Amino acid sequence: MYNINRPISPHLTIYNTQKSSLFSIWHRISGVAMFTLIASPPLFLKLATFSYKSFNILDLMLNNSSLILPWFIVIISVIFLYHIINGIRHFLWDSVVNVNTESIIKDSNTLLALVFLIMLFKFIL
C-alpha cells in the first residue's frame, strides 16, 4: 500500500536550481546571519559573567581584537550590502519591474558586481 522508496521532498529534487530562487534563499540566510552576528557579542558578554571558560574566551578575543575586529567588520559589511541591495531588487519585483528571465539574470550579476565594487572601494581604496 505504501511506497517506501519514494523521496521525502520531491519538490527539491525534480526542479533545477534557478538563480532567482538561490538568491532569495541567500537573502533569507543573510538576514539571519546579520542578526546573529550583531546580536551575539552582547549576549556573549552577558554569558561571560557566568562561566570562567567563557570569560577566558572573551579575554582572548579582546586581547586579539586587532586581528578579529577588521574581519568582523568586513563580514558584516558584505552581508549587509548583499541583503540591502537584494532587498531593493525584491521591492522592484513586488512592483512588477524586471520580472522576466533576462532581467533577473542581469540583476543577479549586477547585484554581485555592486557588492564587490562597494567593498573594494570601501576597504581597499
Swiss-Prot record:
Topology of the protein relative to the lipid bilayer: Multi-pass membrane protein
Cofactor: heme
InterPro entries: SQR/QFR_C/D (IPR034804), Succ_DH_cyt_bsu_CS (IPR018495), Succ_DH_cytb556 (IPR014314), SuccDH_FuR_B_TM-su (IPR000701)
Pfam families: Sdh_cyt
Location in the cell: Mitochondrion inner membrane
Annotated keywords: Electron transport, Heme, Iron, Membrane, Metal-binding, Mitochondrion, Mitochondrion inner membrane, Transmembrane, Transmembrane helix, Transport, Tricarboxylic acid cycle
GO biological processes: mitochondrial electron transport, succinate to ubiquinone; tricarboxylic acid cycle
Free-text comment on the cofactor: The heme is bound between the two transmembrane subunits.
Annotated positions binding heme: H83
GO cellular component terms, semicolon-separated: mitochondrial inner membrane
Pathway info: Carbohydrate metabolism; tricarboxylic acid cycle
Record-level Gene Ontology MF annotations: electron transfer activity; metal ion binding
Domain of life: Eukaryota
Transmembrane residue ranges: 29-49, 68-88, 104-124
Cited function: Membrane-anchoring subunit of succinate dehydrogenase (SDH) that is involved in complex II of the mitochondrial electron transport chain and is responsible for transferring electrons from succinate to ubiquinone (coenzyme Q).
Family that this chain belongs to: Belongs to the cytochrome b560 family.
Subunit structure: Forms part of complex II containing four subunits: a 70 kDa flavoprotein (FP), a 27 kDa iron-sulfur protein (IP), a cytochrome B and a membrane-anchoring protein.
Protein's UniProt name: Succinate dehydrogenase cytochrome b560 subunit
Organism per entry: Porphyra purpurea
Gene transcribed to yield this protein: SDH3
